[in-house]
C-alpha cells in the first residue's frame, strides 16, 4: 500500500531541504511548482486556453508564455487571477494525479506531493498524510530577507499573504521543526517515516 504524503510549509521554512531528503531516501517527489511550469508550455492545452483568454500579449517573442507579464496582468485583477487559476489548477491536479497513480502502480512504498499551497488550494484530498515543515516566525523572516534580498516590510507582506504557518501546523499529521541543523531535520524526518512504516 503506497502512502501518499503531502509536503508543505510556509515560505522560506525549508521545505525544499526536506524534499531533497526524501529523494535521497529514494522516495519519489512530485513537485507542484515544476508541474505548474510544465502544463503551460507552448502547445499544451492549458497554454492554448491562456492564449485564448488573455491574448498573445502575454507571450514572449518565441511564443512561450511570458510569466512575469502574465503575473502582472493577474496581480492587480482578482477576476483575471481566478480565471487563470481555473485554467492552471485543474491541469496541475490532473498531472500530479497521473504521476501519483504511476508510482502507486509501480508499488512504491511512498510518494511525496510537494505542494506549497496544499491547504490554500484545498488539495489535502489528494494525500493520505500531511507533513508540514515549520520554523519560528523570526527564522522565517530572516531566511526570506536573506534568500530574496527583501526588506523587512517586503518579507513580512509576503509571509502574511499566505495562510499562517501555525494554522498549517494545526492541520498537519506530523510537523518537522526546521529551526535547527540539517542533521536535526533529517533525524526528525526519519523518525516520522519509521512511525509511518515507510522506512525500517
Swiss-Prot record:
Pathway the protein contributes to: Cofactor biosynthesis; coenzyme A biosynthesis; CoA from (R)-pantothenate: step 5/5
Compartments (UniProt record): Cytoplasm
Domain DPCK stretches: 4-200
Classification via CDD domains: DPCK
Catalytic activity: 3'-dephospho-CoA + ATP = ADP + CoA + H(+)
Classification via InterPro entries: Depp_CoAkinase, P-loop_NTPase
Domain of life the protein comes from: Bacteria
Stored Gene3D superfamilies: P-loop containing nucleotide triphosphate hydrolases
Family: Belongs to the CoaE family.
Position of the signal peptide: none
Record's protein name: Dephospho-CoA kinase
Binding site for ATP: 12-17
UniProt source species: Bacillus thuringiensis subsp. konkukian (strain 97-27)
GO biological process, alphabetically ordered: coenzyme A biosynthetic process
Primary subcellular site in the record, as a coarse category: cytoplasm
Functional note: Catalyzes the phosphorylation of the 3'-hydroxyl group of dephosphocoenzyme A to form coenzyme A.
GO molecular function terms attached to this record: ATP binding; dephospho-CoA kinase activity
Lineage: Bacteria, Bacillati, Bacillota, Bacilli, Bacillales
PROSITE patterns (alphabetical): DPCK
Enzyme class name: transferase
Record EC number: 2.7.1.24
Any single GO CC term annotated in Swiss-Prot or TrEMBL for this entry: cytoplasm
